[in-house]
């Protein structure tokens, strides 16, 4: 089965009456695999990536979302990579607990970007963010270093 065929299968079998493809609750813990790669997602609607518990690194990169992108309540024992994301409406990155580094770089948001209640044991990298709306960064706890630079914000920068 190709990835294109898999997408067709998932839509045909998991789309509900509201038009949502619900893949929540997938459990790979009992499978003999090294990783699950969810990079490169392209979604015409909204994309929810929440309540994920990862013992290694979590890579959420190269994503194009024409609606809202929600990345919240994520617990990562390694590093969390949220880079090269393009979002048409709003990007929410909230309530993330990361034992390693959190990388939120090269993000382009046509609406607002909300980064709230992020707890990072390592370093937090928030660089090269392009936001046409408002950029909200609040209640971030970082035990390592905080790197913020090259922000281009057309709206308000709310820290």
Model segments located where?
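The feature captures the LRR N-terminal capping module
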Residues: 1-21
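Tandem repeat scaffolds
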Residues: 15-159
